[in-house]
């Protein structure tokens, strides 16, 4: 006998592998989408889409082949574990009745039952995963055509259309196609296949045990939230042969052997041996009634255990959907050559990261209030990739990238609110800075010529007043690209060698002009020094000015610091003729 609680969770590790496969497929689709390029003449465009779809089909087949071995190993493991557990549970009942115990590894018959069900389930899962290639290819073509239509009608820009296509593909997720034409999510299909396979394997073992021992009665397990057609027979004793009139016949009453009956599709009920006169029923009528009682309170309403479980599953599905979107956006960011598309995807990534944080917080609160367990087994597994992007293993990890993006998004929203403090004159000064004023005013400051500086004094007074109203409410990290000569830590004309650059560690950088930074690494061409600056909570004198920037520079996500900005260099590394400096702003 396998307990309903065990059957609810035993496949989590396998489903984590499925989630990783889905993630890889979505990333592959996103890569193809961002490489489609601008909209071209229609017939040529269709040819490009079909070519991309063909390549994606091969991508998916490759991904499936990379993961199938791990999935097969996990299927074998869960079947073995469940088989041993099932017979151990049965042994307790048989020993109490004076019957001998049967162990899995000592029974050739039991091993054959297990092996047959393992083989059947592996074949079913393999066939289902292969159909994802067809469904993914179809989803890609649909997404491309929708994007093309949006751009051609003038309703959307190219960047927004592609970003929408990535979102739609990710939300749809990886799907499987059954021979009947029915379509399901890959994780749902795999869970159904392995749950049904493991449960039927245990049931066949139990009936074999009954046959060998001469026992003619079984008791079904019970759980809250059983479907109505199953609730009528759960937790009751039946006669297997149907010859004992004191008990209802097993097959006719439970529908065992049919998809809709006991141990059928997605069923978590099982059964165990029962010896009349010796065994004690596991479930009283009071216990069965309690399973359907509305005894759990949440937000001032009463719910059954089943209703709460469905509410939790719903929230978990939303979290997985958000993570799929993050995967799509992240892959697009890494693979696009378009700065505007990268900016659009980055903004969406940060927004979805914040949404993920809210969803996870809501789920944890729900579990805490209802006394349910917060499940994280599926959320902690990710694929390990080699240098060519092939899946070569699996590991456990927290999605740190999404965590940091969420924090960055929150910081940006807090800083946006600070712009409300600015006067109209100050807002105009900031906007002018993002245009031509930046070059003019900084040139005056760097020149040191009093006449040039005096000419800009009134403007700088207003700009300084605006920047003084900006205060960092939580630690942020900003980026700045420059060249060695602009670091202002060695005398003018000093030749910067690699050794000299390493000597910068521990030194303080001071910029006498205004300092433009960004929430993201823009990687300006011709600038071989990248500064990553940590700005502590409480720092005063900077504003996040994206919403005030002129259109040309809105995608830079600029954080502007007032003149005299100082930071201390903590670390410096060189990679491919580019220097990466980590620094900390000085309060």
Locate predicted features.
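A general structural signal for short secondary-structure junctions and capping/turn motifs
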Residues: 167-169, 182-185, 207-212, 218-221, ...
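Short, Φ-rich (hydrophobic/aromatic) sequence segments
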Residues: 1-21, 75, 79, 190-193, ...
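Contiguous, non-catalytic segments that form substrate-binding/exosite surfaces or channel walls
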Residues: 126-213
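Conserved aromatic-histidine-acidic binding/catalytic patches
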Residues: 41, 48, 52, 150-157, ...
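Mono-ADP-ribosyltransferase
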Residues: 402-587
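Compact mixed alphabeta submodule
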Residues: 254-305, 549-587
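N-terminal leader/targeting and assembly helices and adjacent pre-domain segments
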Residues: 1-164, 286-428, 432
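Acidic, glycine-rich two-metal-ion catalytic cores of nucleic acid-processing enzymes
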Residues: 184-288
């Amino acid at each position: 006998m396998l307990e309903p609680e065990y059957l609810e969770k035993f496949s989590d590790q396998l489903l984590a592998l499925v989630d990783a496969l889905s993630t890889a497929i979505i990333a592959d689709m996103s890569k193809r989408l961002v490489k489609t390029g601008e909209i071209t003449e229609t017939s040529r465009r269709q040819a490009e889409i079909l070519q991309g779809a063909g390549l994606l089909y091969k991508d998916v087949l490759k991904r499936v082949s990379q993961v199938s071995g791990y999935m097969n190993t996990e299927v074998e493991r869960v079947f073995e574990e469940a088989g041993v557990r099932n017979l151990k549970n049965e042994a307790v009942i048989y020993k109490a009745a004076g019957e001998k115990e049967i162990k899995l590894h000592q029974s050739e018959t039991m091993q054959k039952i297990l092996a047959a069900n393992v083989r059947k389930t592996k074949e079913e899962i393999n066939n289902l995963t292969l159909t994802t290639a067809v469904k993914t290819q179809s989803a890609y073509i649909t997404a491309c055509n929708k994007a093309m239509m949006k751009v051609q009608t003038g309703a959307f820009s190219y960047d927004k259309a592609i970003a929408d296509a990535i979102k739609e593909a990710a939300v749809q997720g990886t799907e499987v196609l059954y021979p009947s034409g029915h379509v399901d999510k890959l994780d749902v299909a795999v869970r159904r296949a392995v749950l049904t396979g493991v449960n039927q394997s245990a049931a066949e073992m139990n009936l074999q045990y009954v046959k060998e021992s001469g026992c003619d009665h079984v008791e079904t397990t019970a759980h809250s939230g059983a479907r109505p057609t199953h609730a009528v027979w759960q937790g009751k004793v039946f006669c297997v042969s149907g010859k004992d009139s004191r008990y209802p016949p097993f097959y006719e009453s439970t529908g065992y052997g049919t998809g809709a009956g006991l141990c059928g599709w997605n069923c978590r009920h099982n059964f165990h041996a029962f010896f009349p006169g010796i065994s004690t029923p596991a479930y009283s009528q009071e216990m069965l009634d309690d399973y359907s009682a509305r005894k759990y309170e949440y937000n001032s309403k009463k719910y059954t255990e089943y209703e709460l479980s469905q509410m939790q599953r719903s929230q978990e599905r939303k979290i997985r959907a958000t993570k799929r979107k993050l995967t799509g956006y992240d892959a697009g960011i890494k693979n696009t050559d378009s700065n505007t598309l990268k900016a659009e995807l980055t903004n969406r990534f940060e927004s979805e990261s914040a949404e993920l944080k809210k969803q996870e917080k809501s789920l944890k609160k729900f579990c805490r209030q209802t006394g349910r367990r917060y499940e994280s087994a599926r959320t902690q597994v990710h694929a390990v990739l080699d240098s060519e992007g092939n899946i070569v293993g699996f590991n456990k990890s927290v999605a740190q990238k999404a965590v940091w993006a969420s924090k960055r998004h929150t910081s940006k929203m807090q800083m946006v609110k600070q712009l409300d403090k600015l006067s109209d004159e100050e807002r105009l000064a900031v906007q002018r800075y993002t245009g031509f004023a930046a070059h003019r005013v900084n040139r005056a400051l760097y020149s040191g010529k009093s006449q040039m500086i005096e000419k800009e004094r009134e403007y700088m007074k207003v700009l300084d007043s605006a920047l003084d109203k900006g205060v960092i409410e939580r630690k942020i990290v900003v980026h700045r690209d420059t060249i060695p000569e602009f670091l202002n830590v060695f005398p003018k004309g000093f030749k910067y060698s690699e050794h000299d650059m390493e000597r910068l560690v521990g030194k303080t950088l001071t910029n006498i002009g205004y300092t433009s930074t960004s929430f993201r690494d823009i990687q300006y061409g011709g600038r071989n020094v990248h500064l990553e600056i940590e700005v502590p909570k409480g720092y005063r004198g900077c504003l996040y000015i994206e919403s005030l920037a002129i259109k040309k520079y809105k995608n830079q996500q600029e954080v502007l610091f007032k003149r005299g900005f100082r930071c201390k260099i903590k670390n410096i590394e060189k990679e491919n003729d580019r220097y990466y400096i980590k620094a900390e702003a000085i309060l």
